[in-house]
Amino acid sequence: MAKHILAPTKIESVGNKPKEILEFFADKKNWVKVPSECGYKEIVTIKPFGEIIAKFDTGNSGMSVIHADKMQVKDKKVTWSLLGKTITSDIIRKEEISVGGLRNYDEDRYDIKLNVEFLSGMYETEFTLDDREDRTPILFDREFMSRVNVMVSPDRKYVVTTKYSLD
């Protein structure tokens, strides 16, 4: 009587590989998401201010900036206005900023956090307060663009949002 030796099946020979592959792809940190295209200007929503024009500046290496009128600092809070609405925010930190380009000077700025709604998501975002009266009220940095997973089209505006009459 001949003895039969069982050879391992293909499934047995790969061990736990299928399980490892499934676990790898089930972990969201391993997912590669294709960025959405957006224009260099888009509309975002920040409560209590509502819809605001924002510029996505790929050359801005510092921090996201928001326009602030009538700033008053008391203790660890700053009261400031934008679009006729006044709010009080906790100061995260005070920084000395070197402003380059045509402006070229140093100044102290206050950093705060605000919730930004964009592309159906809500993002807690740090901003530095600055007088941007003659410029776009919000300037987003590369870190924000990475978090919301957008690729900026530098020659287009309002790709994912509608402009209305805000501009």
For each feature predicted by the language model, list its residue ranges.
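Pepsin/retropepsin-fold aspartyl endopeptidases
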Residues: 2-167
